[in-house]
Amino acid sequence: MTHHIAIIGSALSGNKGASAMLESSIATLSTRVSDARFTLFSMYPSEDARLNDYANLEIIPATPGKLGVVINSLALLYRIAPFLRPTLRRRSRAIAALASADALLDQGGITFTDGREKFLLYNVASILPALNLHVPVIKCAQAIGPFEGRINRWASQVFLPKVTLIVTRGAITHDFADGLGLTNTVRGADYAFSLELAGDERESLEPLIDLSFVDAPGDVVGFAPSVVMQKKVDGRGGQYVHGLVDAIVATLDAGHRALLVPHSTRAGIEKTHNNDLPLCREIAREVGERAGFLFVDEELSSQQLRYLIGRTTRFVTSRFHAMISSLSMAVPTVVIGWSHKYQEVLDLFGLNDRAFGAAEFSTERVLAELARLERDDAEVRAAIASNLPAVKELSVSQADHIAEIVTRAH
């Protein structure tokens, strides 16, 4: 019996954390659900189609405008006008996909949270069509809350109880959900912790990167910046680019090698939404041609990125899923974060003191945290090693919950 799972909020292109979540869900659910096929409602349909190597994954365009206006309107019409349903299924790929789905997985990384009200309409639009078609909605491990803001609290109280299951990504999110009175929650860990390496990453990277850079003796310090953090730091009067450039130069002057790698990329596109390539190119230009410096000016897959990050000695990042990759590969990490979603993941490893926010950003702070990581290397590696198996198990457990809901639909 074929089971059909629709997915929204993730992608193969752009943010490689979203790619890791998508690929992890396909891998884990394909082994738990018989004859599983998947439909991705894509914000970047052309780019995702170009990268789609999955025979059982269909890509359907769902750009913000199309999702918010067309798909939501048709889904509402489907609900209130039963006589039009055959026509709607025949005329709209999106409605046909939803109507045949056993569940919709919402893989947004952080939704329904105070301070991000400009994304609230998209958060609602992502799940409302499925709710109107009475398709079970499962919010894969993600951060939600806090709910102190009037608009966000209202929307959360209206829509989140209608979701079949919310997988909370950490203790802070779970406490926020409890405080809102939600009872449809289960504890989990980010789906990207379930991503497994295929084993061919080195071979696939060799034509793209000189891997002798990470093979040679000595320390390699990795840097994965974020345009989101750049806006937050610069908005406070800081200088994110210059701060990281100076940190990289200081790393090189200390005799270490420095690897600059974008974890969110849209090749051939200069827009910076979910695209750190332009930022990384600016940083690389400022650093210049220096011995021991390597900039990865490529769009790598989530598995290639994880392999490469795993070859570093220490890692500095402002990208959430770059942090997931470094922790998954047991690499001591400095996190420059902007919300509770970073803290609650580091809490799983007892490493919440290894992060700081935009207000504290400076070259001196980055270098001080790197020095502290170097000093505490054995202790930090032991903390990651002792907690990683349980975190991965918690991540994979959401696949069991999803499979139960999907198979129950038949």
Question: PLM ranges: what are they?
Answer:
Residues M1-H410:
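Active-site anion-handling motifs in enzyme catalytic cores
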